């Protein structure tokens, strides 16, 4: 489901742009600070409701403007197999308020936008997926579960709300009996979330490990899911057993909120073995594998956003990534300082856009 058209207004240094896009590769060429990353950021905002560079809305709205707009048209197929364009849009005010439009209807939810516009981001700091704590790897797993298990989003939201209530009760509870009622529902949700996550990782595992070996043939890659509490023990038993410790901490220590994807290379934690370039290549492999798996499972195509394509990658590794992306048949947006860095990827269906001072022109 590629974007056929993208309209951006008052976003960072982009005053206004309206561009027609390729369903294949779209190249954004320009020097640092030109606005090419802002185009990727705007697409990400359209699919996630937030920027990948700043959590502060005021920083992405153009100076002296009160709001920003990002609109797009998504190519869809109807039941009769006829193609049509679905208009989508997001408007953010400087006060942080957000309005989402889908098919011309206002008041839509961000989760609905994310569902119809699955995005994968690969950027220079992306290796943090492998080197930082488990939060990013949980988000990696949950991206896949969200797009393949319709009930996950509501279940995860309910689990987080109940966890917050439990943490508040921990401060005043005199005995575990005061929490047992809450913990029954919390445990039910935790077990369900764990089941979805484990099933997803088991399905993704073969695709991801195979693609990692294609990108990094010199290494043996292994992915393992950790659910966040002791294996083969019911979650409610864990909650009861750890009641006093949780009271001392002031929060619930174990649970789905501690889940992780543990990745090893040659039986050693990945961050202890790979160089920055190799880490980036592995992240690319994992992201592409997720997109491939999504297509195999649901028929949906995700959109890939790749910022600073040449960073940390030599020509051979760039070619491996390009070949894998072309093999997916997905829509891809690539930013690069020079056109020569992506020359081998250009074909008849691709489009090149030159970006300077926030102005985007097809070249």
Swiss-Prot record:
ATP binds at residues 30-37. Its main location: cytoplasm. GO terms for molecular function: ATP binding; single-stranded DNA binding. It is found in: Cytoplasm. GO terms for cellular component: cytoplasm. SUPFAM superfamilies: P-loop containing nucleoside triphosphate hydrolases. Gene3D superfamilies: P-loop containing nucleotide triphosphate hydrolases, RecF/RecN/SMC, N-terminal domain. Keywords: ATP-binding, Cytoplasm, DNA damage, DNA repair, DNA replication, DNA-binding, Nucleotide-binding, SOS response. Coiled coil: none annotated. It comes from the Bacteria. One of its GO terms (biological process) is double-strand break repair. Belongs to the RecF family. The RecF protein is involved in DNA metabolism; it is required for DNA replication and normal SOS inducibility. RecF binds preferentially to single-stranded, linear DNA. It also seems to bind ATP. PANTHER family: DNA REPLICATION AND REPAIR PROTEIN RECF. This is DNA replication and repair protein RecF. It comes from Vibrio cholerae serotype O1 (strain ATCC 39315 / El Tor Inaba N16961). The lineage of its organism: Bacteria, Pseudomonadati, Pseudomonadota, Gammaproteobacteria, Vibrionales.
């Amino acid at each position: 489901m590629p974007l056929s058209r993208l309209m951006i207004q008052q976003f960072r240094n982009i005053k206004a742009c309206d561009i027609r896009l390729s369903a294949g590769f779209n190249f954004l060429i320009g020097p640092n600070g030109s606005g090419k990353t802002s185009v990727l950021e705007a697409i990400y905002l359209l699919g996630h409701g937030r920027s990948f560079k700043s959590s502060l809305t005021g920083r992405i709205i153009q100076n002296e403007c009160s709001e920003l707009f990002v609109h797009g048209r998504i190519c869809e197929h109807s039941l009769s197999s006829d193609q049509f364009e679905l208009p989508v849009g997001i408007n953010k005010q400087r006060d942080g308020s957000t309005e989402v439009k889908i098919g011309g209807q206002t008041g839509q939810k961000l989760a609905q936008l994310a569902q119809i516009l699955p995005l994968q981001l690969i950027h220079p700091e992306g290796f943090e997926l492998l080197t930082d704590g488990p939060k990013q790897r949980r988000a990696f797993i949950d991206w896949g579960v969200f797009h393949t298990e319709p009930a996950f989003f509501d279940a995860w939201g309910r689990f987080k709300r109940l966890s917050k209530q439990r943490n508040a009760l921990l401060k005043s509870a005199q005995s575990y009996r005061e929490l047992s009622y809450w913990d029954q529902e919390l445990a039910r949700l935790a077990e369900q979330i764990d089941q979805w996550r484990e099933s997803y990782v088991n399905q993704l595992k073969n695709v991801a490990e195979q693609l990692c070996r294609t990108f990094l043939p010199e290494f043996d890659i292994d992915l393992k899911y950790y659910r966040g509490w002791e294996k083969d023990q019911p979650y409610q038993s864990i909650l009861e057993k750890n009641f006093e410790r949780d009271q001392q901490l002031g929060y619930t220590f174990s649970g789905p909120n501690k889940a992780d994807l543990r990745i090893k290379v040659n039986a050693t934690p990945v961050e202890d073995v790979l160089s920055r370039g190799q880490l980036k290549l592995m992240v690319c492999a994992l992201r592409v594998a997720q997109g491939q798996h999504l297509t195999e499972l649901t028929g949906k195509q995700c959109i890939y956003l790749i910022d600073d394509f040449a960073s940390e990658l030599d020509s051979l590794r760039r070619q491996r990534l390009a070949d894998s992306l072309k093999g997916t048949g997905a829509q891809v947006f690539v930013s690069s300082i020079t056109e020569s860095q992506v020359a081998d990827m250009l074909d008849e269906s691709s489009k090149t856009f030159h970006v300077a001072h926030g102005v985007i022109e097809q070249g």
